[in-house]
Structures are given as structure tokens and as C-alpha cells.
């Protein structure tokens, strides 16, 4: 029988791991992560998700150029102006910012990327499109954590969507929704930093405290 306590423990300790060793990751582990992704719910079970596994350094370097540009022009300045989110101290937030900067400079060095995509044909992405791909992304993040691998969900490349999707070689009608850099973590796994439920959960009416 499955140990559900282990599942909840993994959820509580699957934080973004942005500092990754460049050492190769066995294909067997990547396959397990992909299987976990393909077990996720999706709209109408249409399974329009597509997963592009990137190991080619030249492709990663081509994307990293735009990834860094997005940091320099948008993400970096936003961090400098932002206060720490709920459940996170200033010291923790500064460490997070440093890790984001590290990933910016070393994004292409992660041994494996999984690019989560949807095959959408001529239809434009809609507000609900993500419902058919982001559950798979979360499954893959949890699977990576269970296997002792570090990963993070990043969508920053979408600030230069056309340029990065061209570098990735995506065909017309296929859109990327996230990139998961995966590798063995340099640091230790630990609990996620989150605020209390009382600040984010309501009952029956917006603003009415949830008392359970």
C-alpha cells in the first residue's frame, strides 16, 4: 500500500532547486519523470501535451541568451523592487534572488531540460490551456524530488516566446509552457516557504475566513 505520508512530505519539501551540478542524469530517471508527467490529468484526456527533452548544449545556449535578456530587462529589476512574499524572510528572499541569478548564468549547464508543450494547432493559447499541461509539470517536479533530483519550473523564456521557441525548433501550432532544468542539486532539499492558510483560504464567501 502506498505511504501517503511520504507523498505529503515530498510536496512540502519540493522547493525550486536552481543550483544544479552539470553531471549527466541517467536516461532511466528522466523516463520515470516523463511517465509521471503523462499520468497527470488533462482536458478531456486529449493528451495534447508534448515533452521535448533537451540535452544538446548548443540548443540550450541559444535559449539561454534570451533567458538572460529576460532577467536583465524584466525579472532582475522586479526582484530588486519587491518585498519578500508571505512566509519568507528578507534573508531567505535574498538567497532566492541569488539562486535566480545563478540559474540565469548557468541555465544552459543543467544536464537535462524538459520543455513542456501543448500541441494546439491553429488555436491561440487560452486562459484554460494551462490546465492541460501544468498538472503534468507538477507531477514531474514531484517525481524529480522523489528521485533525489533538483528541478524548478521556469517560464521566463516566454518573455521572448518567438525567439526561444525558434531556438528550440518547435513546429507551428506547438507552444511551450514551461522549461524544467533537471540535475543533481548542489544544495540540500528543504521545506518550501509559504504563508499561513488563514491568509489565502475563504469559506463560502470571498473574505470569509476558513475555520477548519
What are these regions (language model features)?
Residues 39-46:
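Glycine-rich phosphate/pyrophosphate-binding beta-alpha loops
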Residues 3, 17, 175-212:
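C-terminal helix-cap and adjacent tail motif
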Residues 165-177:
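Short, electropositive alpha-helical surface patch
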Residues 46-55, 146:
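Short loop-to-beta-strand entry elements in the cores of soluble alpha/beta enzymes
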Residues 33-38, 112-114, 119-166:
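Small-aliphatic-rich amphipathic alpha-helix that forms the alpha element of a beta-alpha
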Residues 53-131:
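Glycine/small-residue-rich phosphate/adenosyl-binding loop
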Residues 10, 113-115, 179-181:
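Conserved hydrophobic/aromatic beta-strand scaffold that supports enzyme active sites
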Residues 6-23:
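Generic N-terminal amphipathic, Lys/Arg-enriched alpha-helix
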Amino acid at each position: 500500500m502506498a505511504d501517503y505520508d511520504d507523498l505529503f512530505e515530498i510536496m512540502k519539501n519540493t522547493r525550486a532547486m536552481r543550483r544544479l551540478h552539470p553531471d549527466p542524469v541517467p536516461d532511466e530517471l528522466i523516463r520515470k519523470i516523463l511517465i509521471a508527467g503523462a499520468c497527470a490529468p488533462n482536458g478531456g484526456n486529449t493528451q495534447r501535451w508534448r515533452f521535448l527533452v533537451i540535452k544538446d548544449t548548443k540548443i540550450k545556449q541559444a535559449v539561454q541568451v534570451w533567458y538572460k535578456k529576460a532577467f536583465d530587462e524584466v525579472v532582475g529589476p522586479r526582484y530588486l523592487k519587491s518585498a519578500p512574499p508571505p512566509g519568507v524572510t528578507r534573508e531567505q528572499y535574498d538567497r532566492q534572488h541569488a539562486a535566480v541569478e545563478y540559474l540565469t548564468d548557468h541555465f544552459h549547464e543543467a544536464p537535462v531540460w524538459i520543455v513542456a508543450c501543448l500541441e494546439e494547432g491553429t488555436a491561440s493559447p487560452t486562459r484554460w490551456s494551462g490546465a492541460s499541461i501544468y498538472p503534468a509539470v507538477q507531477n514531474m517536479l514531484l517525481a524529480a524530488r522523489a528521485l533525489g533530483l533538483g528541478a524548478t519550473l521556469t517560464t521566463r523564456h516566454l518573455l521572448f516566446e518567438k525567439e526561444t521557441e525558434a531556438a528550440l525548433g518547435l513546429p507551428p501550432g506547438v507552444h511551450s509552457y514551461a522549461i524544467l532544468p533537471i540535475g543533481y542539486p548542489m544544495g540540500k532539499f528543504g521545506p518550501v516557504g509559504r504563508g499561513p492558510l488563514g491568509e489565502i483560504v475563504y469559506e463560502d464567501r470571498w473574505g470569509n475566513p476558513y475555520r477548519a
